[in-house]
Curated annotation (Swiss-Prot):
This is Extracellular metalloproteinase 4. Pfam families: Peptidase_M36. The keyword Protease applies. Keywords: Glycoprotein, Hydrolase, Metal-binding, Metalloprotease, Protease, Secreted, Virulence, Zinc, Zymogen. Glycans are attached at N27, N176, N359, N385. It comes from the Eukaryota. One of its GO terms (molecular function) is zinc ion binding. Zn(2+) binds at H193, H197. Its cofactor is Zn(2+). Residues 1-9 form a propeptide. Secreted metalloproteinase probably acting as a virulence factor. It is found in: Secreted. The gene is MEP4. It is an enzyme of class 3 (hydrolase).
Length: 392
């Protein structure tokens, strides 16, 4: 046992580190013990054993070229010394030639996100994804199943979220809009987007009910929350409210990304308003509107509280409140999910965020929150009607 502990204490991963969204933003780096150490465990144990592969309490990552339901016996890299360093370059082809690097990247990104969310409140009681909940509440037995290069599709990704106690399943695909084709596991925003579906489905309506985002508008907000967290996490030190971001631009090989409008605080660049949801039947289109509002909220809180050191993984909290505007926005949006009703609409989700801030900070950010939503038509007088919304 002591020798295994010694090896884990030397664990290394060659990956695009946290904050680098895709290969255009930086280089792969060898990271030593990247997990956040104050949490209950490292990434390779679950209370029952040590795993010298991409498996642990929070996730199990493997390839799935057939696209089938099996995963436990699928291929995953193994390293008795816990050294997960494998070759990858953007020119390598086919994707199967760099499967070890892909699986390792997926395992790394997901585990870091699990740790960040844990600090922000998505823990065992909230219904997070862990095999062992260490007697801290919730239902265990539900790590996230992570399929790299899943053969059930292309040019997309998805996350299936059953109730607490049953594993979530992420399917990451390859994208064929470029030569050579690209692996979505190397675009962190896509991985974070998909995992956030698990978060929003577990929190809304309670972890025992994972069908509370099944309506059109609530499902659209599910897409929006996923875009929002992916975008907030990729902020750079020099970013300002004039900085715009896209979604999925690297994997899709589209400079403008896969949404109608970039995320921007400019109404010229992104003119989306609440009433634009009238007549929409696509959850992704509705989500683009919701995430645009949350992007306004993000920058209002950053302008008030600062961005913090975005090169650091760990959120800094004082008395349970993030000290920077970026993580504060993430925290109240996360808390709002747990407060809103099952099958919420925009108005109800907005009110839940206001309630979350009231609970967390005694409402000290009320004005910044209202200004963000009112700028895009979800102000005090906004009224929900599926076919005829009232903006304000």
């Amino acid at each position: 046992v002591h020798s295994v502990v010694d090896y884990v204490s030397a664990a290394e991963y060659q990956v695009y580190p946290w904050g680098i969204n895709d290969p255009t933003e930086g280089n792969r780096t060898t990271l030593h013990l990247p997990w956040l150490k104050t949490l209950s465990t490292d990434w390779h144990i679950d209370g029952k054993g040590w795993y010298s592969t991409t498996r642990g309490n929070n996730a199990i990552a493997q390839e799935n070229p057939t696209g089938g339901p099996e995963y436990e016996n699928n291929y995953r890299p193994k390293s008795p010394l816990f050294i997960f360093k494998y070759p990858y370059s953007k020119a390598m082809t086919p994707p199967s030639s760099y499967r070890d690097a892909s699986i390792t990247q997926l395992f790394y990104t997901t585990n870091v996100y699990h740790d960040v969310l844990y600090i922000l409140g998505f823990n065992e009681k909230a219904g997070n994804f862990q095999i062992n909940n260490w007697n801290k509440g919730g239902v265990g037995g539900d790590y996230a199943i992570l399929n790299s290069q899943d053969g059930s599709g292309v040019n997309n990704a998805n996350f299936a979220t059953p109730p607490d106690g049953q594993p979530g399943r992420m399917r990451m695909y390859t994208w064929n809009a470029s030569i050579p084709e690209r692996d979505g596991c190397f675009e962190a925003g896509i991985v974070i987007h998909e995992y956030t579906h698990g978060v929003s489905n577990r929190l809304t309506g309670g972890p025992e009910n994972s069908r509370c985002l099944a309506a059109l508008e609530s499902g659209g907000m599910g897409e929006g929350w996923s875009d929002f967290f992916a975008t907030a996490i990729r902020l750079k030190p020099g970013d300002t409210r004039a900085t715009d971001y896209t979604m999925g631009e690297w994997a899709s090989n589209r400079p403008n990304g896969i949404r109608k409008y970039r995320y921007s605080t400019s109404l010229t660049t992104n003119p989306h308003m609440y009433v634009d949801a009238d007549g929409l039947t696509s959850v992704h289109a509705i989500g683009n509107i919701w995430a645009s509002m949350l992007y306004e909220l993000l920058w209002n809180l950053i302008d008030k509280h600062g961005k913090g050191d975005v090169t650091k993984i760990r959120p800094v909290l004082k008395n349970g409140v993030p000290t920077d505007g970026r993580h504060l926005a993430m925290k109240i949006v996360l808390d709002g999910m747990a407060l809103q009703p099952c099958l919420p609409n925009f108005v109800q989700a907005r009110d839940a965020i206001l309630d979350a801030d009231k609970n967390l900070t005694q409402g000290s950010n009320k004005c910044e929150i209202w200004k963000a939503f009112a700028k895009r038509g979800l102000g005090v007088g906004a009224v929900f009607n599926l076919s005829k919304r009232t903006g304000s």
